[in-house]
Design a protein with these regions (language model features):
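Short amphipathic alpha-helical interaction patches enriched in hydrophobic/aromatic residues
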Residues: 33, 37, 73-79, 98, ...
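Short alpha-helical hairpin
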Residues: 13-32, 45
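Aromatic- and histidine-enriched alpha-helix N-cap/loop-to-helix transition segments
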Residues: 41-44, 85
Length: 225
């Protein structure tokens, strides 16, 4: 699911321009999510994520969710040790890009949204929200919906799940049919970490995906054992 139909690219382009209030950000997004090492974390991933989130566009904090989506995989290194900083660098990007390219009036209206989006992008490292969100129900709801949508791929149908897992292997320069022992162990640990999370999906809206996602994780873990 790496290639994206032209009409979907145009839709993403228009949505990006509207979100940031400028045409300057889209070329940066298109370039980053089109990097050659990417096979899953591409524009197609953004389109899929926005599709999962479509029912929540009327949420009070939709602008926060939208900013977090654009930023959350902006930096996606797949080499050691750079990959450890992906989330932190992506979070910093949303602050830097808005300061550099958005208008003063946009920044005044969206300053708090950018700050929260920064924190949500950081949260994708553990897929758990900062403790401070617990005292703000609207923030907590927005954060849970965003993080859950990012994990919704785990509840995909078998063919899509297989496509996703093979794409992750390709991103790490692996032959998906014969990955290295080191990759197999690292991938298994990452999947086991997700499987151990309780709850896996934190929002009531995505919670029904849990049984299928857990079965899928069990299947993938067994294949890497």
């Amino acid at each position: 699911m790496n290639a994206l139909a032209p009409d979907l690219v145009r839709t993403l382009h228009a949505s990006c321009d509207a979100c940031f209030g400028t045409t300057a950000v889209w070329p940066l997004v298109e370039h980053a999510y089109g990097e050659p090492q990417r096979h899953y974390h591409t524009l197609a991933h953004l389109a899929e994520l926005f599709a999962h989130l479509a029912p929540y566009r009327a949420e009070p904090l939709w602008p926060v969710i939208e900013l977090a989506v654009w930023a959350h995989d902006f930096v996606y290194a797949t080499t050691l040790p750079d990959h450890a900083d992906n989330e932190a660098r992506s979070a910093q990007w949303v602050v830097q890009v808005t300061n550099a390219h958005c208008s003063a009036s946009w920044l005044r209206a969206h300053a708090s949204y950018v700050s929260v989006a920064h924190d949500l992008v950081l949260a994708t490292k553990s897929h758990r929200l900062p403790d401070a969100f617990a005292s703000a129900p609207d923030l907590q709801r927005a954060g849970r919906i965003f993080l859950d949508a990012d994990l919704a791929i785990l509840a995909a149908a078998p063919d899509r799940l297989r496509e996703y897992d093979r794409a992750i292997a390709c991103e790490w320069a692996q032959d998906p049919d014969a990955p290295s022992a080191a990759f197999r162990e690292g991938r298994k640990q990452a999947l086991e970490h997700l499987r151990a999370q309780a709850p896996l999906f934190q929002s009531a809206e995505f919670a029904p995906l849990t049984p299928l996602a857990q079965r899928n994780l069990d299947t993938l873990i067994a294949e890497y054992a």
